[in-house]
Swiss-Prot record:
Protein name as annotated: DNA polymerase
Compartments where found: Host nucleus
Coarse class of the protein's main subcellular location: host cell
Gene: POL
EC number(s) recorded for this UniProt protein: 2.7.7.7
Organism this protein belongs to: Autographa californica nuclear polyhedrosis virus (AcMNPV)
Family from the record: Belongs to the DNA polymerase type-B family.
Length: 984
C-alpha cells in the first residue's frame, strides 16, 4: 500500500490505456467489445480490443449509419398508395388463415436519428435497445471477431478509416471482414474493472446520502492478467496512512469529498476499462454517489468523446419489484448482484451476498470487518484496514466474472439472439421477444414455382402479447385473446387438421405436467427413462406458434398445423445449432478456447429453446396448457409401453430370464422410474446386465413412438428412496448420491441438511436403519455442543426472502368506495429487516434478498423471536431451538413414511434423545415428541377430494402437478410424530 497525491497518480498512469500510435494490419484480429449509437449524429461508435504482442490494445472507430425503428400508420388508406410510405405486414399474433384472410398491421419504417423524441419513445419496437437494432440491421455485433481489409493507423486510440472518407455501412465489404471463430486459437477479452464504496454513519442508523459521507471508493482494473488497485479516501482532517510493501494498492487521500468522487470518475477515463462491475450498485452505490453529488451531474468520459451521464431503465425482478438499472453508454455496466439474483442457473448458492457467492465459486471470503468497527476506525483515522477491505470487495466480483466466463456467455447471447451487453440482466421473456421480433421481420417462405426462398415478413407487436395475456383489458366483459382486433374466420375455412384450443374468452388456470403419486419406500435397481426435450418436441409436433392461432366465428381459438410457422422454424434452427455446437465442442481436443466458446454457445441455444414454453405460459396460458396436456398423454403412453414389456419373449430369450416385470413406480412430467423384477440369480454380471436391459427397453419404447419423440436411459439407481411427489434421492451406478426436491431447500439450516444427508447416506449405501439413526444423533449432538464455538453461526441459521412489493393498490384517502385494504402482514423477513434498519447495519437487504436469521429464546410467536443473524450475539443472547426441532420432526415423520410402523420405536427413541438434548437449557416453548395415530377418516376425505379433482379420466394413481398433493395416500405408516409442550 503506497500513498500518492492524485496528480502524481494521474501522471503515473497516463500511458496505461494509451499505447501511442500503432498499425492494425489486415492480419490482426480484433473484437467488438461495446457498441454505442448516437442518434443525434447518426453515428455508431465501436469500442474494440486487439491482442498485439500478447498485450491488449484498445481503440474505437465510428461508422456513419442510419438506424431504423417502426411505428404504426393510422392513415385511412383511401388511395392506392400511402402518403407515409407504410408497409403492410401480417400480424405475428393470430393472423388468420392464408388463402382466406390474413390480418395486417400498417407499419412505417423511419430513421431514428431524424425523428422526434416522442416518436422514438412510442415506437412499436420500444422494448429494444439501439444496439439490438444495430445487431438486426447491420453486420456489427458485440462480441464478434473482425479484421480490417486494409492496414489502419491508430492515433489516440482512434481508427478513422481512410483519408477520403470515414467508415460507412454502405462500404462495409470494402473496409471489414468477419472472422470465423474456428480459425482462432485464443480469445480477446474486455478490460475489467470494479468499484465499491464504503459509507459513514452515526453507528445507530443506516447510512443516508443526505447526511453521511462516502469514506472511501475502491477501484480495481484487470488487464493483461494483472490488477491495478486503487483506493480513494476522504477525511476532512489531515490523515496519515502507514505504507506497506506487501500490498500494491495505490491510496489517494482527499479532504474534499466531491474531489474524491470526481477523481474516481477521472480514473475510469484514465484506465479505460471496457466493463465496470459493481455488487448491488444499482440499488445502493450509484444512488448514493448521485445523492452525495447533490445537484452535480455524474458524467463519464471515454477517449476524446463528449462526457455522458448514465441513463436509467426500470427493471422488474421476479418478485415484481421495480428497480432502476443504470447504463453507462460508452462502458458495459453490470450489477453482479442483480445478475446472480435474476439468473435461474444460480440456485445452488445459499444466498446472493458477495461473501456467499465468492466462497462457493472461488473458495475466497471477504475480509471480516464489522461495519461498526469500520466506522470506529474511520473516526479515529485508522484508514489502512478500511482500504484493504474496500479493495478486496472490488477484487472478488472481477474474479467471479473471469471464473464463470461471463464475457463469452454475454457475447454468445449477442451473436446468436441479437441481444446486447445491456440485456445481461434482462429476464428470459425479453430474450424470446427479441428473438421473435427478428425472426418475424426476416421470415421467408419457399416460392412453389421457383423453389427459392423469398421474403415473407410478419410483424411482432409486443402490445398484442399484453392484450392476450390480460395485462391490457380493453373490454372488461371479455378476456385475453378475444380482445384482439381481428377479423373472425368462418368455421368452414378453418383447416381440417387445426386443433381446437377452446373458447377465446375463457379464463385459464395453468395446469402442469403429469406426476404420479409414488408409494414411499426403498427400491433396489430401479432405472429412469426420460424424454429428450419433451416440450420442445411437442411444440414442433403440434406447430406451437402464436402465428398459427386462428380466431373463429364460432367463438373458439384454433391452432393451425403450419410447420413453416415462425417459432417452429426458430425451434428447429436452435436444435440444429445446438447439435452443431456440441459436436464442435466435443471435437476440440487441443483448443481449450474453442471448447469453452462452443460450450457457451450450446448452453445459450439450449436455454433459449427451453424458455419458449415458459414464454407461452406467461403470455398465452391456453397454448401452454395444451402443450402440457399432450405431455401428460405422452407420459401415459410411455408408462403403458414400458409396463407392456413385462415378460416380453424377446427380452426373456435375449437375457436368459424365466420372467421379468416392469413397474413404473414414479413419473414426473417427462421422466419415469422403472422397477424391473426378476430372479437375479439368473444373471452373472448384475450391473452390466441391468444396463443392457435398460438400453433394450429404451430401444423398444422409442421404436413405438412417432413425431420425433425419444426417451433415453438416464440412470441406473442401485438404491432409490421415494418419499413423495418431487421428493426422492438415489445412489446411482457410479456410486454418486443425488437429491431431488428433498433435503435441498435453502430455508433449512445448513447443519440440518448435512446431518440429514449423512444419515440418509447410511441407508443408501448400507441399507442400515441403525446406522442412520446413530449418525443423526451423533451429528445433532456435535452441532449442539459446538454452537458458537468451532461451528459457524451461518450453519444454524434459517433464511427468508424479503419482498416489499405491496401488491394491489392501496386505498387512498380520497377513495370512499370499495373495501378497506388489508393490513400489511409482518413476515419474519420484514421483521428482521426492520431490526437491521433500526440498528444501522452496513448492509440492508433489498427486495428479493434472503435474510439469514435465528430465533432467540423469548416468549412470543416465531416472528417475534426472529432475529437477524448479522446482529446475533451468542454471548448476550440465548438461541431458541424450537424451529430446528420442528424441522427435525418433519424429517422423522418422513422416515416413518418410508419405513413404516415397524421402525417407529427406534425412530422415537432417537428423536426423544435429540429433543431432550436441545430442550435442556431452553426456557420457552419446551416441547417433546409424541407418537399419535393418524386420523384415517380425514385421510379418506382428502383422497376423495383429490380423486374428484382429477378430470383426466385417469386411474387413482395419476395426478397432475397442479393438483393438490396427497402425502398420506401412498404412505406406509399409521403413526406420526407431534410436538407437545412439556408438562411443568
Amino acid at each position: 500500500m503506497k500513498i500518492y497525491p492524485y496528480n502524481e497518480l494521474k501522471t503515473r498512469f497516463a500511458e496505461y490505456a494509451k499505447p501511442g500510435e500503432f498499425n492494425i494490419t489486415s492480419a490482426d484480429t480484433f473484437r467488438i467489445i461495446r457498441l454505442h449509437y448516437d442518434e443525434k449524429q447518426g453515428c455508431l461508435f465501436a469500442f474494440c480490443n486487439t491482442n498485439i504482442k500478447e498485450r491488449v490494445l484498445q481503440f474505437y472507430f465510428k461508422v456513419k449509419l442510419n438506424l431504423y425503428s417502426y411505428k404504426q400508420c393510422y392513415d385511412k388508406h383511401i388511395f392506392p398508395s400511402c402518403r407515409n410510405k407504410c408497409i403492410s405486414y401480417t400480424t405475428f399474433v393470430a393472423p388468420g388463415v392464408e388463402g382466406n384472410y390474413l390480418n395486417k398491421i400498417n407499419v412505417i419504417k423511419y430513421e431514428r436519428n431524424k425523428a422526434a423524441p416522442s416518436d422514438n419513445a412510442a415506437c412499436l419496437d420500444k422494448f429494444l435497445h439501439n444496439v439490438n437494432r444495430v445487431h438486426m440491421q447491420t453486420p456489427f455485433v458485440e462480441g464478434a471477431y473482425m479484421r480490417f481489409k486494409k492496414t489502419q493507423r491508430c492515433q489516440n486510440n482512434y481508427v478513422g478509416g481512410s483519408t477520403t472518407r470515414m467508415f460507412n455501412l454502405q462500404h462495409f465489404n470494402e473496409d471489414f471482414e468477419l472472422v470465423d471463430e474456428m480459425t482462432l486459437t485464443s480469445g480477446i477479452m474486455p478490460v475489467l474493472s470494479c468499484y465499491d464504496i464504503e459509507t459513514h454513519s452515526d453507528g445507530h442508523n443506516m447510512s443516508k446520502a443526505s447526511v453521511d459521507c462516502i469514506m472511501s471508493i475502491g477501484f480495481v482494473v484487470y488487464k493483461n492478467d494483472e490488477y491495478a488497485k486503487f483506493c480513494f479516501m476522504y477525511h476532512k482532517l489531515p490523515t496519515q496512512i502507514p505504507e506497506t510493501y506487501d500490498d500494491d494498492t495505490y491510496v489517494v487521500m482527499f479532504q474534499n469529498e466531491i474531489d474524491m468522487i470526481t477523481a474516481f470518475f477521472d480514473m475510469i477515463k484514465i484506465t479505460n476499462p471496457d466493463v465496470i462491475l459493481d455488487f448491488n450498485g444499482d440499488v445502493f452505490d450509484l444512488p448514493y454517489i448521485l445523492g452525495r453529488l447533490n445537484k452535480t451531474k455524474m458524467l463519464l468520459k471515454r477517449y476524446d468523446l463528449p462526457a455522458a451521464a448514465p441513463t436509467t431503465k426500470l427493471f422488474i425482478n421476479k418478485l415484481g419489484n421495480k428497480v432502476d438499472t443504470y447504463y453507462f453508454n460508452y462502458y458495459i455496466h453490470i450489477d453482479l448482484y442483480k445478475f446472480f439474483s435474476s439468473d435461474s442457473n444460480q440456485h445452488k448458492v445459499e444466498n446472493f451476498q458477495l461473501n456467499t457467492i465468492s466462497s462457493y465459486y472461488l473458495g475466497e471470503n471477504k475480509i471480516d470487518l464489522p461495519w461498526t468497527e469500520m466506522v470506529k476506525m474511520y473516526n479515529t483515522r485508522r484508514l489502512d484496514v478500511i482500504a484493504k477491505y474496500n479493495v478486496q470487495d472490488c477484487m472478488l466480483p472481477i474474479k467471479l466474472f473471469v471464473k464463470l466466463k461471463m464475457a463469452d456467455s454475454v457475447y454468445s447471447q449477442c451473436i446468436l439472439h441479437r441481444l446486447c451487453t445491456d440485456d445481461v440482466i434482462c429476464n428470459i421473456s425479453h430474450l424470446i421477444s427479441v428473438a421473435c421480433f427478428y425472426a418475424a421481420i426476416t421470415n421467408t417462405r419457399i416460392n412453389e414455382s421457383t423453389g427459392k426462398e423469398e421474403p415473407d415478413p410478419y410483424f411482432f407487436n409486443k402490445n398484442d402479447l399484453s392484450i392476450i395475456s390480460g395485462q391490457f383489458k380493453a373490454d372488461k366483459a371479455a378476456a385475453g385473446i378475444s380482445n384482439l382486433k381481428r377479423k373472425l374466420i368462418p368455421l368452414k375455412n378453418i383447416p381440417k387438421d387445426a386443433i381446437n384450443l377452446g373458447p377465446a374468452n375463457q379464463t385459464v388456470k395453468y395446469k402442469g405436467g403429469k406426476v404420479l403419486k409414488p408409494r414411499a419406500g426403498i427400491y433396489k435397481n430401479a432405472f429412469s427413462l426420460d424424454f429428450n426435450s419433451l416440450y420442445l418436441t411437442i411444440m414442433i409436433a403440434i406447430c406451437a406458434c402464436l402465428s398459427n392461432l386462428i380466431l373463429c366465428e364460432d367463438g373458439n381459438v384454433y391452432l393451425n398445423h403450419n410447420s413453416r410457422a415462425i417459432v417452429v422454424k426458430l425451434l428447429l434452427k436452435l436444435l440444429s445449432e445446438r447439435c452443431k455446437f456440441k459436436k464442435n465442442r466435443d471435437n476440440q481436443s487441443e483448443s481449450a478456447f474453442l471448447y469453452d466458446l462452443y460450450d457457451q454457445k450450446q448452453n445459450s441455444v439450449k436455454r433459449t429453446a427451453n424458455s419458449i414454453y415458459g414464454y407461452y405460459g406467461i403470455f398465452y396460458k391456453v397454448l401452454a396448457n395444451y402443450i402440457t396436456r399432450v405431455g401428460r398423454n405422452q407420459l401415459r403412453l410411455a408408462i403403458s409401453l414400458i409396463e407392456g414389456l413385462s415378460n416380453d419373449p424377446e427380452i426373456l430369450e435375449k437375457f436368459n430370464l424365466g420372467s421379468i416385470t416392469f413397474k413404473v413406480v414414479y413419473g414426473d412430467t417427462d421422466s419415469t422410474f422403472v422397477l424391473p423384477t426378476f430372479n437375479y440369480n439368473e444373471i452373472s454380471n448384475e450391473t452390466d446386465t441391468l444396463k443392457q436391459i435398460c438400453t433394450h427397453v429404451e430401444t423398444r419404447v422409442n421404436n413405438s413412438f412417432t413425431d420425433g419423440y425419444k426417451m433415453a436411459f438416464e440412470n441406473l439407481m442401485k438404491v432409490l428412496i421415494l418419499l413423495k411427489k418431487k421428493k426422492y434421492c438415489y445412489l446411482n451406478s457410479e456410486n454418486k448420491i443425488v437429491y431431488k426436491g428433498w433435503l435441498v431447500k435453502k430455508d433449512m439450516p445448513v447443519f440440518m441438511r448435512i446431518a440429514f444427508r449423512t444419515a440418509v447416506e447410511q441407508i443408501l449405501r448400507h441399507l442400515d436403519m441403525d446406522k442412520c439413526l446413530q449418525s443423526l444423533q451423533t451429528s445433532f449432538y456435535e452441532y449442539y455442543d459446538e454452537f458458537a464455538k468451532s461451528k459457524s453461526l451461518t450453519d444454524y441459521s434459517f433464511s427468508m426472502t424479503y419482498n416489499d412489493n405491496p401488491g394491489k393498490k392501496r386505498k387512498s384517502t380520497d377513495d370512499n368506495e370499495g373495501p378497506s385494504p388489508k393490513r400489511r402482514v409482518i413476515t419474519v423477513a420484514r421483521h428482521c429487516r426492520e431490526i437491521l434498519v433500526n440498528k444501522g447495519t452496513d448492509f440492508v437487504p433489498g427486495n428479493g434478498d434472503r435474510i439469514p436469521y435465528l430465533l432467540i429464546d423469548i416468549e412470543g410467536k416465531v416472528t417475534e423471536k426472529a432475529y437477524p443473524l448479522r446482529l446475533f450475539d451468542p454471548v448476550k443472547m440465548r438461541i431458541s431451538w424450537i424451529k430446528h426441532m420442528g424441522i427435525l420432526c418433519t424429517f422423522m415423520n418422513e422416515l416413518l413414511e418410508i419405513f413404516g410402523d415397524e421402525q417407529k420405536d427406534k425412530i422415537a427413541k432417537c428423536f426423544t434423545a435429540i429433543m431432550q438434548k436441545y430442550m435442556q437449557n431452553q426456557l420457552y416453548d419446551r416441547k417433546e415428541p409424541v407418537l399419535v395415530k393418524i386420523n384415517q377418516k380425514k385421510c379418506s376425505v382428502k383422497r376423495k377430494r383429490d380423486d374428484d379433482d382429477d378430470n383426466d379420466d385417469d386411474d387413482d394413481d395419476d395426478c397432475d402437478s397442479s393438483d393438490s398433493e396427497n402425502d398420506t395416500q401412498c404412505a406406509n405408516n399409521t403413526y406420526k410424530f407431534c410436538l407437545y409442550k412439556m408438562k411443568k
